[in-house]
């Protein structure tokens, strides 16, 4: 079964989701909406990418859309999501990737245009969040608007799940060492709510807030209130790393932690988590499709209850692949499979 999908917002995640969809046999992008981009520019932005290289297929444009590998993709320029005629393209599922319509009420506007489900590619204040490999099996077909959480939550949640399932996670603090993103500044500029966030991204290590750790409690209820964290924005363009320092209920050695991660990555979290004992650096993970790459040689243990775990993630490519995987999964549930 091929699921027909629309994308609202052809920014960083919208374009990387599109590229991932081309590689996914169960998902076909049939429409894109972005009021700020014309079709010829959309084709250029899809074809060339400074981080992920040239698009491997064929991209052309016409007045009303893109032709990608011989398949036509309708292109709209509506500002109001309610006015996007998703139904005329057959797009049953819509990816909301503008970063603007992240609440259930705002994202529900897509339903007026004929979409059956809306997947928000960002954390949401009120829409149910799903992380593949962690809580996707709790999805029910009556949910119309859902969130794929954040890239950091998608890395941290599988990591925390393995610790909690095997050894009990009492409490933990997370730091994500995160590549800069489009919301940051190329040179110092005004940022009234976050003064540090207004400093030049490529010149500074910038402490920042993140709700990614607390969000784990929403996808793993037993960990609610047990995790919190912060972010350090660093001068790299892509790939980030989670540092989880936590206390376990059961006595455990670091070798036992490694074995649990290795086992999970080969079984229930296969495709979501991977395990590595190589001497990795961030650029080695550019384009990696996993949500969480456990770095077995980077972690340490203070004692048999207090450990530090390190896991990499491509915050663009890996996250975008999960958006597509989530759509394929919920479409299967909706179809009764």
From Swiss-Prot:
Gene Ontology BP terms: glucose metabolic process; glycolytic process
Binding site for NAD(+): 12-13, 34, 79, 315
Annotated localization: Cytoplasm
SUPFAM superfamilies per UniProt: Glyceraldehyde-3-phosphate dehydrogenase-like, C-terminal domain, NAD(P)-binding Rossmann-fold domains
Domain of life from the UniProt record: Eukaryota
Binding site for D-glyceraldehyde 3-phosphate: 150-152, 181, 210-211, 233
Active site, UniProt feature: 151 (nucleophile)
InterPro entries for this protein: GlycerAld/Erythrose_P_DH, GlycerAld_3-P_DH_AS, GlycerAld_3-P_DH_cat, GlycerAld_3-P_DH_NAD(P)-bd, Glyceraldehyde-3-P_DH_1, NAD(P)-bd_dom_sf
Sorted UniProt keywords: Cytoplasm, Glycolysis, NAD, Oxidoreductase
Pfam family, one: Gp_dh_C
KW Glycoprotein (keyword) present: no
EC number: 1.2.1.12
GO molecular function: glyceraldehyde-3-phosphate dehydrogenase (NAD+) (phosphorylating) activity; NAD binding; NADP binding
Entry similarity comment: Belongs to the glyceraldehyde-3-phosphate dehydrogenase family.
Protein name as catalogued: Glyceraldehyde-3-phosphate dehydrogenase
Organism the protein comes from: Coccidioides immitis (strain RS) (Valley fever fungus)
């Amino acid at each position: 079964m091929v699921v027909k999908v629309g994308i609202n917002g052809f920014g960083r995640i919208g374009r990387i989701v599109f590229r991932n969809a081309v590689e996914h046999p169960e998902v076909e992008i049939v429409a894109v909406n972005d009021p700020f981009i014309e079709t010829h520019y959309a084709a250029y932005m899809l074809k060339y990418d400074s981080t992920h290289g040239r698009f491997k297929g064929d991209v052309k444009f016409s007045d009303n859309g893109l032709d990608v590998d011989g398949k036509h993709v309708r292109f709209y320029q509506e500002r109001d999501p309610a006015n996007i005629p998703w139904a005329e393209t057959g797009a049953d599922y819509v990816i909301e990737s503008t970063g603007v319509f992240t609440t259930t009420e705002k994202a529900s506007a897509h339903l007026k245009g004929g979409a059956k489900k809306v997947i928000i590619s960002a954390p949401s204040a009120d829409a149910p969040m799903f992380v593949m490999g962690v809580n996707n099996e709790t999805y029910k077909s009556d949910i119309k608007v859902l969130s794929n959480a954040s890239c950091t939550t998608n890395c941290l949640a599988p990591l925390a799940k393995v610790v909690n399932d095997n050894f009990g996670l009492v409490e933990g603090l997370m730091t994500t060492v995160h590549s800069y993103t489009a919301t940051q500044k190329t040179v110092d500029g005004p940022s009234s709510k976050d003064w540090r966030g207004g400093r030049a991204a490529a010149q500074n290590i910038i402490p920042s807030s993140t709700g990614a750790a607390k969000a784990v409690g929403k996808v793993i209820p037993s960990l609610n209130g047990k995790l919190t964290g912060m972010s350090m924005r660093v001068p790299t363009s892509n790939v980030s790393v989670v540092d989880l320092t936590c206390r376990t209920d059961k006595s455990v050695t670091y070798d036992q932690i490694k074995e649990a991660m290795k086992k999970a990555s080969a079984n229930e979290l296969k495709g979501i988590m991977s395990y590595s004992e190589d001497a990795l650096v961030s650029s080695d993970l550019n384009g990696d499709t996993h949500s969480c790459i456990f770095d077995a040689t980077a972690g340490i243990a203070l004692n048999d209850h207090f450990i530090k775990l390190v896991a990499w993630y491509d915050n663009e490519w890996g996250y975008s692949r999960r958006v597509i995987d989530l759509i394929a999964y919920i479409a299967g549930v909706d179809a009764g499979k």
